[in-house]
């Protein structure tokens, strides 16, 4: 049996950095990544056979817990009939109809294979429909790794301390205006100066890629009003929050309706599915109806769609989100209480099945505030919890995720470990 260290050494010889997505490399926390061999419910097991309570959840998709039997069965049954057709299927129509039925802002939807594809195409669609070039995004919000969006971004870029990517020519981002999240005044000023040139505003309505940051009161409604007034397209990037924090995402909780929405993660149930959709008059600009081109060999893949359909059915059951939210809140509150009892500067927040942990005196509301949190304290906390079998994201700038299988016993075990760790941090 290979150890995690042996596997990482082997991986580094064939894969850049030893990983296929940067944050997995443990670079911001130090140490050796855990190579996961299997997962079930709220647990993962590494290459050395050690079991962990998992709060990464594949970075959001595992809302039902890992390897849910009904999702696995759906994938197996679909795979028997063929892995990919490159042609329309009834299942993809059913998934599209299900998404439209659940999100009031969706009138039509196009399936893709990732969140990056969804956001990249939504931006292209907004530009094509409006005939404008400039876009507004926000510091610390991550919308995938397309060139025009890799400016002061969150997720792995923020984790490694360089929120803008090398290899992106300045002219590619010349039309990208990057503003402070939760600051409506700067958005108003940008529209006052460039209103006739702005194609869209794209925002994580609850930011989950600079840890977890909720929108300030009136921020999303203000974006809606400004976009409507200036004829710009409002895009909610709900790749992470869509069906993760509630049955209608952030737009359901706030009542703010975007023009376009991007989705991924939960809607694929752990398989590669993304989507973008919204107003029908905008969606008619997409090929083959209009001149905005988008295509994908594996878009609407039948096996991935089967996983998505099974997941969407299960999360639609009565009481699902009430239970999920209660467990997530219990975790966040329990961590906060134990840190306070130990005298450790620490805050926690939660919404739906997402939570944020911050080594600071208050819950941050912006990129600047989350960047000021104590990352060294987080590193010590992360490794001490990992030693005790609790698997959090290996970054101080990523949200955490609770699944439907994180029951009271799992939460209690996590809080017991945290109580021990906070005592060592105080010392």
From Swiss-Prot:
- Entry keyword Plastid: no
Q: What keywords does the record list, in alphabetical order?
A: Cytoplasm, Isomerase, Porphyrin biosynthesis, Pyridoxal phosphate
Q: Which SUPFAM superfamilies match?
A: PLP-dependent transferases
Documented EC number(s): 5.4.3.8
Instruction: Specify whether Cytoplasm is a keyword of the entry.
Output: yes
Q: Where in the cell is it found?
A: Cytoplasm
Name a GO CC annotation attached to this entry: cytoplasm
What residue ranges carry the coiled-coil annotation? none
Annotated positions of the N6-(pyridoxal phosphate)lysine modification? 265
Per its record, what are the GO molecular function terms?
glutamate-1-semialdehyde 2,1-aminomutase activity; pyridoxal phosphate binding; transaminase activity
InterPro entries in UniProt:
4pyrrol_synth_GluAld_NH2Trfase, Aminotrans_3, Aminotrans_3_PPA_site, PyrdxlP-dep_Trfase, PyrdxlP-dep_Trfase_major, PyrdxlP-dep_Trfase_small
Instruction: State the needed cofactors, names only.
Output: pyridoxal 5'-phosphate
Q: What is this protein called?
A: Glutamate-1-semialdehyde 2,1-aminomutase
